[in-house]
């Protein structure tokens, strides 16, 4: 009888330990995934030409240029991936073309990198903030002269889900403009 009580007590002890372990793991997993990715942007002057975002004409081509600072805040307790940050050009809600991500430029003989050492994909540590200089460009000839009425900031998350939010509304695509830069950060996501 006494052995049966000891065996029964041991089984209860093991079961309660296992249940307690799984409850603790579930709670830790839930807590580490609590939080979000916040993305802020700020339009700035181009590092090479010292011009703000907009449309620019040369003798042979028209360009759409967007120099941008981006700040990514990870409020989760686990690392997060923000992959392939780009600008999408939309016409009446449909994606027409993505811009070209500029990886680097040469200044006084020194190569300076955009993004994360030339990459527009970012690994953000838990409860951290990352700030990056980005630059995007598109030639009018690359889009066949098509117009667009909206520019969206786009990226893929850890699960390969694509996210897109409006950054600018465009009234007259390909008409030369020199827009003002942002005075403060704007939350996009």
Predicted features along the sequence, with ranges:
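Short, solvent-exposed loop/turn segments enriched in Ser/Thr/Gly
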Residues: 62-69, 131, 149-150
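Membrane-embedded hydrophobic alpha-helical segments
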Residues: 1-32
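Short, surface-exposed ligand- or partner-binding patches at beta-edge/loop junctions that are enriched
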Residues: 141-159
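Acidic, serine/threonine- and proline-rich intrinsically disordered appendage/tail regions
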Residues: 163-189
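Low-complexity, acidic Ser/Thr/Pro/Gly-rich terminal tails and inter-domain linkers that flank the onset
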Residues: 27-61
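The feature marks short-to-medium sequence segments in extracytoplasmic or secretory-pathway proteins
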Residues: 77-123
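Solvent-exposed, conformationally flexible loop/turn segments
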Residues: 125-129
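Asparagine-centered strand-capping/turn motif at beta-strand->loop junctions
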Residues: 57, 70-79
């Amino acid at each position: 009888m006494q052995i049966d009580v000891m065996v029964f007590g041991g089984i209860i002890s093991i079961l309660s330990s296992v249940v307690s372990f799984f409850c603790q793991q579930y709670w830790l997993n839930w807590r580490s995934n609590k939080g979000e990715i916040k993305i802020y942007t700020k339009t700035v002057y181009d590092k090479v030409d010292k011009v703000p975002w907009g449309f620019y004409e040369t003798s042979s081509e028209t360009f759409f240029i967007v120099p941008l600072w981006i700040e990514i805040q990870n409020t989760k307790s686990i690392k997060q991936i923000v992959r392939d940050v780009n600008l999408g050009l939309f016409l009446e809600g449909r994606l027409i073309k993505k811009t070209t991500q500029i990886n680097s430029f040469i200044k006084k003989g020194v190569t300076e990198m955009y993004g994360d050492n030339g990459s527009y994909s970012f690994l953000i540590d838990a409860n951290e903030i990352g700030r990056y200089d980005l630059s995007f460009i598109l030639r009018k000839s690359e889009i066949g002269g098509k117009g667009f009425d909206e520019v969206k900031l786009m990226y893929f998350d850890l699960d390969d889900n694509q996210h897109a939010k409006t950054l600018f509304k465009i009234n007259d695509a390909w008409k030369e403009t020199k827009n003002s830069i942002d005075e403060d950060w704007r939350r996009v996501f």
